[in-house]
Swiss-Prot record:
A GO term from the CC aspect: cytosol
GO molecular-function terms, A-Z: heparin binding; identical protein binding
Lineage of the organism: Bacteria, Bacillati, Actinomycetota, Actinomycetes, Mycobacteriales
GO biological process per UniProt: adhesion of symbiont to host epithelial cell; heterophilic cell-cell adhesion via plasma membrane cell adhesion molecules
The protein's name: Heparin-binding hemagglutinin
Gene3D superfamilies for this protein: Apolipoprotein A-I (1.20.5.1230)
Keywords in alphabetical order: Cell adhesion, Glycoprotein, Hemagglutinin, Heparin-binding, Virulence
Post-translational modification: Glycosylated. Glycosylation may protect the protein from proteolytic degradation and be important for hemagglutination. It suggests that the carbohydrate moiety may be located within the C-terminal domain of HbhA.
General remark: Serum from patients diagnosed with active tuberculosis that had not been vaccinated contains antibodies that recognize HbhA, whereas serum from healthy individuals does not contain any.
Length: 199
């Protein structure tokens, strides 16, 4: 009797799995049938559209010479030239209006005080960005030098004195305006002081 209860316990999950597989198979078969039907409908629809398009093209080929003849009869070369000149004048006039409008908008922007302020502020930000970039480059260079010196000491290699690299860095800073150079030198000295404390 214990064996029957074990079989019954196993039987239900197996039958559930078999039922799920059967349901999945039925669903897949239904999908395949639907896809086949749709494919056949699409083929039929496509064939009819192709036939309609061919019929239209054939009719256009037949009607085109007649339509061209009618157009030639309706419009002489002079009438066509006049129509083209009219379109050209309208396009040129519209273009000129847009140019005038753009010039007026630019003048309004320039006459506003905020435009000048924004322009001056933008120049200030650019100057600050240049200063900060040069400052960061100086800091990175000095820190790289310090790391190189430490590594050389560990290996036992003697590096040239700091006086030569400092002379090279100074002319690069002098190339900038005097106010910026003074601002750059002060942070660079602070960075050097930090290196000394780190050793």
């Amino acid at each position: 009797m214990a064996e029957n209860s074990n079989i019954d316990d196993i039987k239900a999950p197996l039958l559930a799995a078999l039922g799920a597989a059967d349901l999945a198979l039925a669903t897949v078969n239904e999908l395949i049938t639907n896809l086949r039907e749709r494919a056949e409908e699409t083929r039929t629809d496509t064939r009819s559209r192709v036939e309609e398009s061919r019929a239209r093209l054939t009719k256009l080929q037949e009607d085109l010479p007649e339509q061209l003849t009618e157009l030639r009869e309706k419009f002489t070369a002079e009438e066509l030239r006049k129509a083209a000149e009219g379109y050209l004048e309208a396009a040129t006039s519209r273009y000129n209006e847009l140019v005038e409008r753009g010039e007026a908008a630019l003048e309004r922007l320039r006459s506003q005080q905020s435009f000048e302020e924004v322009s001056a502020r933008a120049e200030g930000y650019v100057d600050q960005a240049v200063e900060l970039t040069q400052e960061a480059l100086g800091t990175v260079a000095s820190q790289t030098r310090a790391v190189g010196e430490r590594a050389a000491k560990l290996v036992g290699i003697e590096l040239p004195k700091k006086a030569a690299p400092a002379k090279k860095a100074a002319p690069a800073k002098k190339a900038a305006p005097a106010k910026k150079a003074a601002a750059k030198k002060a942070p660079a000295k602070k960075a050097a002081a930090k290196k000394v404390t780190q050793k």
